[in-house]
Structures are given as structure tokens and as C-alpha cells.
């Protein structure tokens, strides 16, 4: 059975009963037994009223920028989490993408690979997981791989880490993304799972129209 990627977008200032909605969503996922979730803040975006919001003010919260929450879910968790999250999102967007299945292999030429992990600043003089991942992808001739840092999230330790509460936290979530050609996919996710000491790898088909 494939996994699914749930992606939620809403504005940072959205609240539910005086509590920040994005934080309530993380808590909801945590309570429903979701194994991990990552929250990121966009640098700009268009909201539900067609307003463009920019990263102008020093205190990021007052820019009311878009918040992106992503989580990889098993099929039996989808409806459960959807029922918990949907009532919280008064204005926003929720999408679900189906993960890779063996039947997808010959139907598509490219696949997007997303690795959800975290940084660990306690590993002095040692490579972070994301550095190992980038080195590995480089050997696979991947170009345009990206690493983005989250502002909150949790993983298998089930502890919610937050940049807002703990600005010096050494466990902030990271997302590594890239696109892989079909010929390079066999065995790649298995190798990535060996590199990623704490996190999850998600793969789904994608149409690549330019890569140079």
C-alpha cells in the first residue's frame, strides 16, 4: 500500500480559539498518531483574498506569510487526519498526493524525491544527514537538489520542536528535494533510507519539462 503526502497551506496569523491554527494542526497530527510533520514558512505568497504578502517586517509573524505543513501518511491515517485537520482550516488549502507504486515505474520518466529529516548541531565536526544526502545525490548525477529549513515539526521522537519557542534548537526539521530519472530510481530510496538516520523518504511521479 502506498504512502500519501498531505500538504496544508494557510496564513500564519490564522487562529482557532485564540490559538495559532498552524500549531493546532501540528498538535492534531501528533494526537492522531502521525509519525512526523514539518512546518515551513514561505518568503512571500498570495492569500485567500488575493493579497500578496511579503517578508518585510523583522518579526516574521506580522508579515502573515503562508505556512506550509507537510506530512507523509499511511492509507489508514488519511481519513482520520483529514477529519481532524479540515475543521481547523477556515481559509487555506489541503492537498493529498499518492506515493510511488511499482505500477508507476514504466508509466513515468521522472520522480520527485522528498526527504524529511532534521539537523543535529550536537554532531560536532560530523556531516549532517542532509550533507550526506546531497553528496549521495551528486554521485547519482542529480542537479537542482534543494534543502529548506522548517520552523517547527516533529519526528519519530514525537517531540514538537519549534523555532519560535526554541530559536537555538538543534533538531529543526529539514526537507531535501530533487527529481530523479526513472533509470536512476531502482534502489535509490533504499540507499537513502540507510543514509537518513532519522526521517522519511517520499517518492511520487512528476512531469519534468525542463532540467538544465
Model-derived features: positions:
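Positively charged, small/polar-rich N-terminal and surface patches that mediate targeting and assembly
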Residues: 1-212
